[in-house]
UniProtKB/Swiss-Prot annotation:
Highest taxon in the source lineage: Bacteria
Reaction it catalyzes: GTP + H2O = GDP + phosphate + H(+)
Membrane association type: Peripheral membrane protein
Name of the protein: Elongation factor 4
Molecular-function annotations in GO: GTP binding; GTPase activity; guanosine tetraphosphate binding; ribosome binding; translation elongation factor activity
Residues binding GTP: 14-19, 131-134
Organism: Yersinia pestis (strain Pestoides F)
Amino acid sequence: MNHIRNFSIIAHIDHGKSTLSDRIIQICGGLSEREMAAQVLDSMDLERERGITIKAQSVTLDYHSKDGQTYQLNFIDTPGHVDFSYEVSRSLAACEGALLVVDAGQGVEAQTLANCYTAMEMDLEVVPVLNKIDLPAADPERVAEEIEDIVGIDATDAIRCSAKTGVGVPDVLERLVRDIPAPEGDPNGPLQALIIDSWFDNYLGVVSLIRIKNGSLRKGDKVKVMSTGQSYNADRLGIFTPKRVDRDVLNCGEVGWLVCAIKDILGAPVGDTLTLTRNPAEKSLPGFKKVKPQVYAGLFPISSDDYESFRDALGKLSLNDASLFYEPESSTALGFGFRCGFLGLLHMEIIQERLEREYDLELITTAPTVVYEVITTNQETVYVDSPSKLPALNNIEELREPIAECHMLLPQEYLGNVITLCIEKRGTQTNMVYHGKQVALTYEIPMAEVVLDFFDRLKSTSRGYASLDYNFKRFQTSDMVRVDVLINNERVDALALITHRDNAQYRGRDLVEKMKELIPRQQFDIAIQAAIGNHIIARSTVKQLRKNVLAKCYGGDVSRKKKLLQKQKDGKKRMKQVGNVELPQEAFLAILHVGKDSK
């Protein structure tokens, strides 16, 4: 046990976590030269293409230290994006220490802070590492000061390395072995194993990643899931050296994988505790706090035959991604689908892409909304996550919208731009601190504005230098209204949006104009209107296609022309009564871009 070290690698996006893990695997000989690839742990195609880590991955390696002893390193590579911070906190729960990787050129960014505080709250030993010292722009001295200044941990002897070239990585390993404490636990006590992550394998059923806190687990043992009380056989277990390797026993303090032939997706929820049936532990380990989705959107299969396979796919995906929430929903325009909850827009995009790729589905997404708290006139509190569920205006006593607390770190010269952006997003400033050349800004901004396009706009207004970390703060009363879209006097539920009254007119007009471009012309006029309640705030018309019925009258009598035009008009009128308008997929996505290009 004294020779086991469990640690995670945490950092801001693109500070070199995955590259550092590659080097560590290489030095410890986890993979042969031939099998080595860049970002070996990013196993999803999607992760490779976007160059980001989405799922935390674990690896077990043997490290021969300079003091002549062999240590077993279990480490977990974690994502850096704010949408996946839940993955990070889960990975940290399985560790005794964390490597805080900071880019020596970029310096401390918002996610560095957020992840580091998460680690400190869990009482982990944080080892700072300055990465990318081979860059011409690197300034390790300044960054070490920044770490002490902003994060508040001692960085005077922070290790300097370059994960790309491999310089300094052996020092990182030595420091790990020296500074990170060995796991504590009772090897002879009753088994307690924490489920860190699980995913669905088509051949094996549910595969779980577990950290053994007390006791040990042998192949063939009967294990019990503590929350459900169900018992299973431990058929196979082992470790990742990134490859799956079978073992006969997992000892106290180790991290490994386990297959129990669980077919039911909800059989072993993440954050649960496993114990032995014959000698069960008294109480379960403290799990993880449940995360609440911040953004909701409707997902609908394009062809309704896919509904069943879509449901299965969501089930399997939610096993792998504990923060995904979904419930069935039906829409008059789009048929049957699911209302899904996500942690942010990136999360939503990734889930949609994974569904389309891994499960071969074609999906339509409706506009994302946040959760509103509504007090009705008979004093009930309801939570509304979709515009169509919002009660009628005269039944609403007050409507409260979620406010996010946003922490931003940015260079001084972009301060003006960023403040302008925050004010435009209805934000109020709560704090501002200068650290050297960096400014730490704290704003309270409505969640609806943050999830819409705040991150993109922040990046573009600060040339990519500003970084953002946000969390839900509270609900606050606000004057929000629902803007409905009517096409030929019929409401289209999938196009409704909830917005602030001040922006409603402008958003409504923008949406109507966008729809006008996207709806193909028909044989009759199509009226597109935006309305708040019964009050129409914007309208535009998609003009009809019409034949030139006068082409055959050379010269000729005006009454003859009138008769032909009148006949055409009557025909169009009849057509309009029976005709219905097919909306193209782009029309539903138009909402996402309202207010982006025009400002």
